[in-house]
């Protein structure tokens, strides 16, 4: 295979909000450059979204890559490396890795919907990575498309000159050849020194049953060849390279990858944990001293417990999580036991969509039936003895008398909404203890910035936002800092026994409402037993809400015909004693639905 000069390589990513046509544009680029024949493309959409769940939800979760060959109008042959990045806020880490491997971005905006909140976040990521950005307006063939208005919006909101934005319809292929020319003329080539020591960026890694761990790399300097001994600078692990190649989107083997090229390697790596995303790869025999800048390990933001409904599935769940961890560096888990739910795992996620997707993948790919406990965030606690601790599980909270102060994480949220729903959106943010920072208008849409406690967002904020705005509002957030908060630990007691899986940290002002809603829900779903079951919500020793499940009535006097009243009384007293004893020692069966419903309660 002939080596293409570095000036003829273009590494670019496509940045867009969910559902603005990013993966469809990628399909067209692959088709036009001959990456896949029309026959192979037939009946296939979103070629790069390999997971079913990605296609169904219309979202990209893993960053994908493909190499395309293109002969431009100037008669030269070019190599395009396209990185298809996720668009959702939870996967911002995957976006930042992919962007670091590229020099330019195509900003795809739906001409009928305009700029959305996550478009903004991802564009800022691209600008931070020093990218040249080419605006592309998609879906211009729709009757609702307003390209001029959207161009103006790109200039007003993002501050990019959109006068020469490329107009396309990715679905029909209209204007897509112009995108290819714009990539050649408007995006810069990579820089790199072929003669230098190997320096490469680890962009992503996943597990393949036959090949072991497949590592996606972007070579910065030097050459990566078969048989070479490489070292991961972050973990210090060394390996011999077995295969080198790239995706077209099919795996294609080559002898070496030069500077500026993006491809994959395999090296008999058993654990994806050894290949930290964002790590620097170098030659083991003459390593470089400085790592590539700007990468940090992904830090989980939202935590929740996952427990198998059937206790026998515990080992299957452990193996399944291990497999998902292979493909998802940002998912973490540790073992946890719960008196109510048995053995399970405490898992850390990047955000709520990430949590939902992991849950769905566990149930789909591994056929597991799971219960998830209430999501929580990391709280910092200053104790009276001067020490500080961090907890993300309410069960680990120390005694109240030992705590001097609790701090909770806050986020800055950017919400874009049509102005007719602004009132409902502001009320929602206000109810969630938000502080409004700014409000600006972009055409007929309002852009609001709010400071909100993350604790209030992880439950159901996104769903509520979509329902108050009829699905039109878009939302993006980033963590800002920790602030002191008046938080209390609320426990749910069933028959005077605390149910650890339902305990949570809530703000004092919201505790009563949430507690009442949870006990009412539990009352509906716990079946009657032979004895009375009190369901209580408590903060410390104080009960803030109570409901009672009535006992089943068993008529012990049925066998007495007439006769002496003392006989009946004796039987009733005996039953009373038995019920009292049963209440002391009896176990209440809490059905799974009761847990799930209590955790989904909206206060």
From Swiss-Prot:
<keyword id="KW-0648">Protein biosynthesis</keyword>
<feature type="domain" description="tr-type G">
    <location>
        <begin position="7"/>
        <end position="191"/>
    </location>
</feature>
<dbReference type="InterPro" id="IPR000640">
    <property type="entry name" value="EFG_V-like"/>
</dbReference>
<dbReference type="InterPro" id="IPR035654">
    <property type="entry name" value="LepA_IV"/>
</dbReference>
<keyword id="KW-1003">Cell membrane</keyword>
<dbReference type="GO" id="GO:0097216">
    <property type="term" value="F:guanosine tetraphosphate binding"/>
</dbReference>
<dbReference type="InterPro" id="IPR000795">
    <property type="entry name" value="T_Tr_GTP-bd_dom"/>
</dbReference>
<dbReference type="GO" id="GO:0005525">
    <property type="term" value="F:GTP binding"/>
</dbReference>
<dbReference type="Pfam" id="PF06421">
    <property type="entry name" value="LepA_C"/>
</dbReference>
<dbReference type="Pfam" id="PF00679">
    <property type="entry name" value="EFG_C"/>
</dbReference>
<dbReference type="InterPro" id="IPR013842">
    <property type="entry name" value="LepA_CTD"/>
</dbReference>
<dbReference type="GO" id="GO:0003924">
    <property type="term" value="F:GTPase activity"/>
</dbReference>
<dbReference type="InterPro" id="IPR038363">
    <property type="entry name" value="LepA_C_sf"/>
</dbReference>
<keyword id="KW-0378">Hydrolase</keyword>
<feature type="binding site">
    <location>
        <begin position="19"/>
        <end position="24"/>
    </location>
    <ligand>
        <name>GTP</name>
    </ligand>
</feature>
<keyword id="KW-0342">GTP-binding</keyword>
<protein>
    <recommendedName>
        <fullName>Elongation factor 4</fullName>
        <ecNumber>3.6.5.n1</ecNumber>
    </recommendedName>
</protein>
<comment type="similarity">
    <text>Belongs to the TRAFAC class translation factor GTPase superfamily. Classic translation factor GTPase family. LepA subfamily.</text>
</comment>
<dbReference type="GO" id="GO:0003746">
    <property type="term" value="F:translation elongation factor activity"/>
</dbReference>
<dbReference type="Pfam" id="PF00009">
    <property type="entry name" value="GTP_EFTU"/>
</dbReference>
<dbReference type="InterPro" id="IPR035647">
    <property type="entry name" value="EFG_III/V"/>
</dbReference>
<dbReference type="InterPro" id="IPR031157">
    <property type="entry name" value="G_TR_CS"/>
</dbReference>
<dbReference type="InterPro" id="IPR005225">
    <property type="entry name" value="Small_GTP-bd"/>
</dbReference>
<keyword id="KW-0472">Membrane</keyword>
<keyword id="KW-0547">Nucleotide-binding</keyword>
<dbReference type="Pfam" id="PF03144">
    <property type="entry name" value="GTP_EFTU_D2"/>
</dbReference>
<dbReference type="GO" id="GO:0005886">
    <property type="term" value="C:plasma membrane"/>
</dbReference>
<dbReference type="InterPro" id="IPR027417">
    <property type="entry name" value="P-loop_NTPase"/>
</dbReference>
<dbReference type="InterPro" id="IPR004161">
    <property type="entry name" value="EFTu-like_2"/>
</dbReference>
<feature type="binding site">
    <location>
        <begin position="138"/>
        <end position="141"/>
    </location>
    <ligand>
        <name>GTP</name>
    </ligand>
</feature>
<keyword id="KW-0997">Cell inner membrane</keyword>
<comment type="function">
    <text>Required for accurate and efficient protein synthesis under certain stress conditions. May act as a fidelity factor of the translation reaction, by catalyzing a one-codon backward translocation of tRNAs on improperly translocated ribosomes. Back-translocation proceeds from a post-translocation (POST) complex to a pre-translocation (PRE) complex, thus giving elongation factor G a second chance to translocate the tRNAs correctly. Binds to ribosomes in a GTP-dependent manner.</text>
</comment>
<dbReference type="InterPro" id="IPR006297">
    <property type="entry name" value="EF-4"/>
</dbReference>
<dbReference type="GO" id="GO:0045727">
    <property type="term" value="P:positive regulation of translation"/>
</dbReference>
<dbReference type="GO" id="GO:0043022">
    <property type="term" value="F:ribosome binding"/>
</dbReference>
